[in-house]
Amino acid sequence: MLQSALVGFSDRMQPLFGYGRGDDMPTPHNTANTGDIAKTVIMPGDPLRAKYIADTYLDNVVRFNNVRNIYGYTGVYRDVDISVMASGMGMPSMGIYSYELFKYYDVDNIIRIGSAGSISDKVDLRDIVLAIGTSTDSNYAKQYNLPGIYAPVADFGLLNCAYEQSKLYGIAAEVGNVVSTDVFYNDNPEYNKAWSNMGVLAVEMESAALYMNAARLSKNALAMFTISDNLMNGQSLSVEERQEGFDDMIKLSLETARLYNIGGGV
């Protein structure tokens, strides 16, 4: 099977390990066929959250992927086709799944949803951050051989839709920069303070790879996060509080996707 997946692969941007796909084949990480996935995908990190969104918010749901238990579903939300698929944790995982969705499944828009840790007094527990841009300690951009430092940013149309919907539904949302880190258990005690001094709102682990993939492939991306932990004072949400806060973010992401789709982008 691996040999057949390699035959005929001629993409200019060949993956590091040589995997590829033919025009009528799934990727090594996704069993979906062409047309199974909507133009807009909501991407939580947790596969069970992807299932929860599909079960709770979408109609006429069809599962298109369960490879490595990374669940993917397509359904209908308020008359608009929307897919939801998990990304896993970290930039390498997000990098793989978002790249394949953009490149091989003709997805145009990805909205990343997840949790983040606040490092700013501008956002506290339960608040939602809309990431206009993302700094990173990752070397993900090294593959592009750029002569400088790239600044990954969100698509303004998606960002504007999300911000307007947050005001409409009375959801507390702050627009600003986040930082994507490769390290969850950071040994540097000054890490968060240094980024906070630059006005960064929160720390997370995926958005830089998503934004860079979108830029490289001329697609659209937005990341939004619920603040589940305040890294400045040590406070955090309970399991029940996290679910309630995440529901607000899920609704915001779905309404953003719907408005963006019916409006043809902004």
Stretches with model-predicted labels:
Residues 59-66, 170-176, 261-266:
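Flexible, glycine/charged-enriched surface loops at secondary-structure junctions
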Residues 19-160:
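Metabolite-binding pocket within alpha/beta catalytic cores that recognizes anionic/polar moieties
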Residues 161-169, 213, 252-260:
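Generic non-transmembrane alpha-helical segments
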Residues 152-198:
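Active-site rim beta-loop-alpha module in soluble metabolic enzymes
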Residues 1-24:
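N-terminal amphipathic/basic-hydrophobic helices that include classical n-h-c signal peptides
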Residues 208-242:
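Zn-dependent metallopeptidase/amidohydrolase metal-coordination segment
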Residues 47, 117, 179-184, 209, ...:
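Glycine-rich beta-alpha junction loops
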Residues 231-266:
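His/Asp/Glu-rich mid-to-C-terminal helical/loop segments that flank catalytic regions of hydrolases
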